[in-house]
Structure formats: structure tokens, C-alpha cells
């Protein structure tokens, strides 16, 4: 979803290891006060985050946005639920997909687009243990091959 004029803030690498990403959706996120400055500084953590539907709206859970250090005393709860901003038809499409067995909504990346914080939300299906092992084995084999090629040339 990301195009030119975007700046990656954080990427959920754990999500790409634990899930097969079937589709992506760009969403806005409703942030309060100094949360935007904290996100811009990269002070967020979301390895176990997910999105859920409530009352026809998308809500992001388990995202920790640290308090902005240079702010005054008011700071929102760092672990609160945050509303995701998407069009009604996009939410309906996501709802149909999530109602299928095994699908979940996982935030893949946070990035800036035209000065706004955006979330790339993935429609994901969990990987089986043997899928993860195969991925690790393929990665290790590729690493070993590149090492042997480097040694051969030096």
C-alpha cells in the first residue's frame, strides 16, 4: 500500500513470520495529544497487536505507544484501544473476510503519509508450525549459499 512520499516508522516482522498475509488495507488511526510525536519518534511497540470489529468500527488493541518525554503532565493511557479510520465499505469487506474461519486483522506497519500516521492492516491467516520451520530452513539455506559464494570469491 505504501507509495512514494511515505516514511516507514515501524514494521511488525513477527506478523510476517506468524501469519500468511492475504490482503492489505491502509487505515488512518485516531491518536490523542502527544501520541503523534511519540509515534513519529518511533516509540511504539506492537508485536501482539490485532484489530477487531465493534459496532461497525475497527479498533486496534495491544499497541503500546510510549508517553512523549517532552510533554506536560497530561498523557493518554499508553495501552488504550485506538480507533482505526476506514471507509464503511472497506470495513464491511474486512468483516466478511474475518468471519471466515482462521482469519484475523494484524497491523503490519506504521508509516507517515503526507504528514499523517497510517497503519497497514493485514488480513492474515495463522501459519502452522511446519510452515514456520520450512521458512527458517529456507532462510538458513539461502544464508549458507551466500556465505559460500562470498568465501569462493575472496
Swiss-Prot record:
**NCBIfam families (UniProt xref):** PRK05422.1, smpB
Q: Which family does it belong to?
A: Belongs to the SmpB family.
Which compartments is it annotated to reside in? Cytoplasm
Give the GO molecular function terms. RNA binding
UniProt protein name: SsrA-binding protein
**Which CDD domains does the entry mention?**
SmpB
Q: Which Pfam families match?
A: SmpB (PF01668)
Magnesium as a keyword of this entry, yes or no, is no
Q: Does the keyword Cytoplasm apply?
A: yes
Question: Which GO biological process categories is it annotated with?
Answer: trans-translation
Task: Identify the gene encoding this protein.
Answer: smpB
Domain of life where this protein originates? Bacteria
Q: Which GO terms describe its cellular component?
A: cytosol
Keywords per UniProt: Cytoplasm, RNA-binding
Source organism of this protein record = Treponema pallidum (strain Nichols)
